[in-house]
C-alpha cells in the first residue's frame, strides 16, 4: 500500500497538475524557465487530492501551536480551508481559523489587506502551494506580521528546491514544512 505522500505525488500525475517539458519548459512567476510546472489549483479541484493534502498537513502540523492559517490569494484559500476542515474533523479541539492575504488592500469597504478570523497575537501558519524563490511566502509573512500575527511556520504542498526559496524564508525566522518536493513528483509515475 503506497504511503499518503506517494499517493499525493501520484495524484499530481493523475490530475495533470504536474507538467514536464524538457525542451520548451515553462516560465515561472520569477521569470525563470523551468522544465517543470506544478499546478496546485488543478490539484486542489479534486476532492481526493484535498483529502490527501488535509491528512498530510494535519500530520505535519501536529506539534505546531497555532490559532489560524492562511496565505496569499487565490491559491492559499483552498489549501487553508482544506487543512482547517480536516484538522477539525480529526479533532474538534483543533479549530484553526483561516484567513487570506490580498495582493493589495481593497479600495472600498473596510480596505483590508487580510480577510478572515484573525486577532493580533494569534499564532499563524502561512500556507502556499509551491515554494520556489520564497517571494509569495515572504509577502504573506510580512503582511501577517504587520497585522499582528505571530508567524513561525509555513507549509507548502511542493518545495521545488530552487532559487534558495527555503533558505530565504527560514532566514526570516519561519520554519518551512513541505508535504512533497519536486523529487517526489519526478519520481512518481
Regions picked out by a protein language model, each given a short descriptive name:
Residues 1-65:
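Active-site-facing substrate-recognition patch
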Residues 2-14, 142-189:
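PRPP-dependent phosphoribosyltransferase catalytic core
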Residues 62-67, 119-121:
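Short helix-loop-beta connector
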Residues 63-64, 79-96, 167-182:
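Short acidic, glycine/proline-enriched helix-loop-strand junctions
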Residues 66-75, 155-156:
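Short glycine-rich phosphate-binding loop at a beta-alpha junction
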Residues 71, 126-127:
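Generic enzyme active-site microenvironment
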Residues 79-125, 135-138:
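Short, glycine/charge-rich flexible loops or terminal/linker lids adjacent to PRPP-binding catalytic cores
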Amino acid at each position: 500500500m503506497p504511503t499518503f505522500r506517494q499517493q499525493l505525488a501520484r495524484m499530481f500525475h493523475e490530475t495533470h497538475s504536474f507538467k514536464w517539458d524538457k525542451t520548451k519548459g515553462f516560465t515561472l512567476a520569477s521569470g525563470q524557465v523551468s522544465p517543470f510546472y506544478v499546478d496546485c489549483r488543478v490539484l486542489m479541484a479534486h476532492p481526493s487530492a484535498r483529502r490527501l493534502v488535509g491528512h498530510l498537513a494535519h500530520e505535519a502540523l501536529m506539534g505546531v501551536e497555532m490559532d489560524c492559517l492562511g496565505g496569499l490569494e487565490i491559491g492559499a484559500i483552498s489549501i487553508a480551508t482544506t487543512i482547517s476542515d480536516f484538522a477539525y474533523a480529526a479533532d474538534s479541539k483543533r479549530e484553526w481559523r483561516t484567513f487570506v492575504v490580498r495582493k493589495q488592500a481593497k479600495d472600498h469597504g473596510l480596505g483590508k489587506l487580510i480577510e478572515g478570523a484573525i486577532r493580533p497575537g494569534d499564532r499563524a501558519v502561512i500556507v502556499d502551494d509551491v515554494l520556489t524563490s520564497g517571494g509569495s511566502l515572504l509577502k504573506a509573512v510580512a503582511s501577517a506580521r504587520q497585522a499582528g500575527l505571530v508567524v513561525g511556520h509555513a507549509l507548502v504542498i511542493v518545495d521545488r528546491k530552487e532559487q534558495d526559496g527555503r533558505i530565504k524564508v527560514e532566514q526570516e525566522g519561519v520554519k518551512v514544512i513541505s508535504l512533497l518536493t519536486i523529487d517526489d513528483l519526478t519520481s512518481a509515475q
